[in-house]
Amino acid sequence: MKDIRKTQELVGSVYLEPIKFTLVSREEGPGWTVEKTKLIEMWYRRFLTLVKIYPNQTIVPTKDIDTFWHYHILDTRKYMDDCDKVFGSYFHHFPYFGSRGEEDKANFDKTF
């Protein structure tokens, strides 16, 4: 339980305000509401926490979590620094979850 809390604190310390600002923007992002952005930020942080705690498991993000992740990745320096802080190395994005057959779709469905 202690490791989960430490990981939650670590992931919680990642500064995501610039990403949230872009997600709310209708010009630079999808124009999400502030409420939706806060909710998806919470789920994104939970996703990162699960990936950190279970590195050998396939953890598949929802579409909204994946969108948040994409906007995080676009700030390449920040994303690399955040990955180093949380994972100790770069956390690669794999965009094909759920689209490579039944087993892949089952992994997607199992995660969320």
Region annotations inferred by a language model:
Residues 1-112:
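Intrinsically disordered, low-complexity, repeat-rich regions
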